[in-house]
Amino acid sequence: MSRILNMNEYISLNHYLILSSLVFTIGMFGLFMHRKNIINILMSIELMLLAVNINFVAFSIYMQELSGQIFSIIILTVAAAETSIGLAILLIYFRNKGSIEITDINQMRG
C-alpha cells in the first residue's frame, strides 16, 4: 500500500494534465479528420470525454478528495449507456439504408 502512495511522488499533476491534453488533442484531431464516418466521430468524442475524466481523477487525487473520482465513474457509466443506445440506432439505420455516412444521415427526414 505504501508503494502505491509513493507513486504520486514520481507522477505529478502536470503529468496527468499533459496526458489528458494529448488524449483530448487526439480526439479533436480524429473528430476533424474523419467527418464522413459516424463510428469514427463517436470514438473521437469518447476519447475527448476520457480526457476530461482523466482531469477529474487527477484533480481529485491532487486535492485528496473522492468526489472527482466518483463523478468520473458516473460520467463513464452514462457515456457507456449513451454509446450503446447510439450504436443500436446506427445498427438499425445501417440495416435499413446500407450506409452510415454522415451525408446519408443528413438526408433523413422524419
From Swiss-Prot:
Compartment(s) of residence: Cell inner membrane
Biological role: NDH-1 shuttles electrons from NADH, via FMN and iron-sulfur (Fe-S) centers, to quinones in the respiratory chain. The immediate electron acceptor for the enzyme in this species is believed to be ubiquinone. Couples the redox reaction to proton translocation (for every two electrons transferred, four hydrogen ions are translocated across the cytoplasmic membrane), and thus conserves the redox energy in a proton gradient.
InterPro entries, alphabetized: NADH_UbQ_OxRdtase_chain4L/K (IPR001133), NUOK/Mnh_C1-like (IPR039428)
Cellular-component GO terms for this entry: NADH dehydrogenase complex; plasma membrane
Keywords linked to the UniProt accession: Cell inner membrane, Cell membrane, Membrane, NAD, Quinone, Translocase, Transmembrane, Transmembrane helix, Transport
Organism lineage string: Bacteria, Pseudomonadati, Pseudomonadota, Alphaproteobacteria, Rickettsiales
NCBIfam families assigned to the protein according to its UniProt record, in alphabetical order: PRK05715.1-2, PRK05715.1-3, PRK05715.1-5
Topology relative to the membrane: Multi-pass membrane protein
Entry's Gene Ontology BP terms: ATP synthesis coupled electron transport
Matching Pfam families: Oxidored_q2
Similarity annotation: Belongs to the complex I subunit 4L family.
Protein known as: NADH-quinone oxidoreductase subunit K
Complex formation: NDH-1 is composed of 14 different subunits. Subunits NuoA, H, J, K, L, M, N constitute the membrane sector of the complex.
One annotated GO molecular function: quinone binding
UniProt source species: Rickettsia felis (strain ATCC VR-1525 / URRWXCal2) (Rickettsia azadi)
PANTHER family: NADH DEHYDROGENASE SUBUNIT 4L-RELATED, NADH-UBIQUINONE OXIDOREDUCTASE SUBUNIT ND4L
Gene3D superfamilies documented for this protein: 1.10.287.3510
Catalytic activity, reaction form: a quinone + NADH + 5 H(+)(in) = a quinol + NAD(+) + 4 H(+)(out)
Leading EC class: translocase
UniProt EC number: 7.1.1.-
Main location: membrane
Residues in coiled coil: none
